[in-house]
Design a protein with these regions (language model features):
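Short, glycine/small-residue-enriched coil/turn segments at secondary-structure junctions
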Residues: 24-44
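Short, structured beta-strand/loop micro-motifs enriched in basic residues and often containing a Trp
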Residues: 65-73
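Sec/Tat signal peptide C-region and signal peptidase I cleavage site
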Residues: 16-20
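Extracytoplasmic
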Residues: 31-33, 46-48, 86, 102-104
Length: 121
C-alpha cells in the first residue's frame, strides 16, 4: 500500500507544473490592449504561441497566445507578422505591474482581427 501511495504522490507532484502553467490566476481579470512593434516573431513551437513586442514606452512584452493548433486556426502563423511590424494585442496582463507579460485572447494586425480564444471575453 505504501508503494501505491508513493507512486500516486509522485504522479500528483509531477503534474503540478502543468496545472500551474495553464492557469490564468497570475493575470488580471480586466482586459488590456497593448500596441507595439514585433521584436521576436511568432513561435508556434511549444504549449502556446508566443512572441515579443515593444510598446511606445520601450517595455518589451512577452505575449502568450493559445496553443499552436488553435492559434493557427485563428489565422496566426509564424510568418504573419514580421519583426518590425506593428500589432495590437488584447488580453489579460500579469498582475505584477512590473512584469510585462500578457495572455492574449485577440490580436489585430494590418486591420484584421485574429481571435485566438473565441468566447474568452
Amino acid at each position: 500500500m505504501k508503494k501505491v501511495a508513493t507512486l500516486v504522490a509522485v504522479f500528483m507532484m509531477s503534474a503540478l507544473p502543468a496545472f500551474a502553467h495553464h492557469g490564468w490566476g497570475g493575470n488580471e481579470d480586466k482586459l488590456t490592449d497593448v500596441t507595439g512593434t514585433v521584436t521576436t516573431a511568432v513561435s508556434l513551437s511549444g504549449p502556446h504561441g508566443t512572441m515579443k513586442i515593444k510598446d511606445a514606452e520601450g517595455h518589451v512584452w512577452d505575449v502568450t497566445m493559445a496553443p499552436p493548433n488553435r492559434t493557427q486556426q485563428a489565422g496566426v502563423t509564424e510568418k504573419l507578422m514580421p519583426i518590425g511590424s506593428t500589432v495590437t494585442v488584447h488580453g489579460h496582463r500579469n498582475k505584477n505591474p512590473k512584469t510585462y507579460e500578457i495572455k492574449v485572447t485577440k490580436l489585430t494586425f494590418n486591420g484584421k482581427l485574429y481571435d485566438v480564444y473565441p468566447g474568452m471575453d
